[in-house]
Amino acid sequence: MCSSDLQNKSYKDYIMGTGYDMVEKTAEWAAPITGIPAERIKQLAADIAAAEAPFICQGWGPQRHTNGEDTSRAICMLPVLIGKIGLPGTNTGQREAEPPTYLVGSLPFENPIKTAIPVYQWINAVDHGKEMTATNAGIVGADKLNNDIKFLWNYAGNCITNQHGDINYTHDVLADESKLEFILVWDTVMTDSAKYADILLPDAMRSEQLNMQTQGYSEYYTAVVVGGPAQEAPGECRSSYDVCADIADKFGKKDAFTEGKTQEDWIKELYEAGAKADGNMPTWDEIKAQGVYKRTLEPAIGLVDFRTDPVKNPLSTPSGKIEIYSEQLAEIAATWELEEGDVINPIPVFTPGFQGYGSVTDEYPLYCTGFHHKSRTHSSFGFIPELEQVARQQLWINPADAESRGIASGDTVAVKSPAGEIRIEALVTPRIIPGTIGIPQGAWHKADMNGDRVDEGACVNTLTTYRPTPLAKGNGPAHSIIAQITKA
């Protein structure tokens, strides 16, 4: 949807080479970029165009590159361009066709602070927060930050270091205690992030307290699980609700915080509100006894209501329609302050991004990508030695790249990037293409930060850059690293 002059601005112009860079986006053009033969690209295009119900779906990997925002949008264009949306068997191009369906809601709490930052930008808000604005850092709810972050509360997470880009940069910022003055970490295990805490509080695990979990991301069913405690919390471990209630009591605000309710009272209230809306859920006493309630859902078809009646069922875009050309993005591109190489465009375009495969150098000739490991959920369970034994933390390297470096499976190798260095066991395999290496994300960082900083734990974020993506200001570098490998 475009109200401005469309000359040389349409998606068709970009694809056909009659606008923008005047380069026709043929299969031959795409082949060296993708590493896929032109004939195979043409066959895929023909198959998509001929399919009665093409189900086009992307995971969350493509967006986690420095050029991933445009890649993600381009994938969503495929079903749009052939008109195969809102029909049985089709999809929107996203991973989830529809929002998740939860049987139970959350606490009725509204944050009185409306100013917010992209979560990936938190360390910059510590280092130079007052320089961050809506146009250079994606600040929302205000034109700029008026203060640097001075206090950090990290609950049940490992993103101070381990799960955040460029660990060495983060460490250097945190080492200056005139910047971030106080760190509170509240967790069940001693993560690398927990090592930076001024105060470390031991939390009760979910299995050590009454808890409720919801499952809503499946297309075919939704569920709620109530249970616990399976065992008593050891030592001084306590639930966060009870601790916060005691803190509120010290300020004379316990009644305002708890509203006279225990943790179970709140969980019961939330459950019963969901049960009332659902109409078929068990009573509170019944769900506590049976533990799980699962309900089958009708299969969702993405954008089916919009296709049926686009006037009655407009989308949440400014125009209410599918926007191949975005006036909103055009305005952002014209007004935001972008780093050299950053691209925001009103249509999806190909851009190599920064530290992409086209950025390799003689010093860093390999492209490195992260991926999820089967023994961990991000960094959760990364401290369990039995899991490490059966599913080792290994770098994937193609035989051609390994042979030229004298590397065999089982060798310990040094991996260097502009951001840092790790040690990791090599796995030589043809399952990864030449010129590219893969490192499972989530391994626990283990380095002498007062010494050589070489990470013996092989955390991929020792190698990543901190620079965020152009639009969302998010974690694009997770799969965009340039590196070199040598036998250690």
Residue ranges and their predicted role:
Residues 204-229, 236, 434-436:
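Catalytic or ion-translocation cores adjacent to nucleophile or general acid/base/metal-coordination motifs
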Residues 169-172, 178-182, 188-191, 223, ...:
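Phosphate/diphosphate-binding loops
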Residues 29-33, 59-66, 98-100, 158-160:
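Conserved short loop/turn motifs at secondary-structure junctions
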Residues 238-290, 379-381, 385-396, 400-488:
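Long, contiguous, secondary-structure-rich segments that constitute the structural scaffold
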Residues 4-51:
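Long, well-ordered, tryptophan-enriched scaffold segments
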Residues 77-196, 204-212, 230, 288, ...:
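Extended redox/cofactor-interaction regions of prokaryotic respiratory oxidoreductases
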Residues 20-22, 42-55, 138-151, 357:
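Glycine-rich phosphate/diphosphate-binding loops that line cofactor/substrate pockets in enzymes
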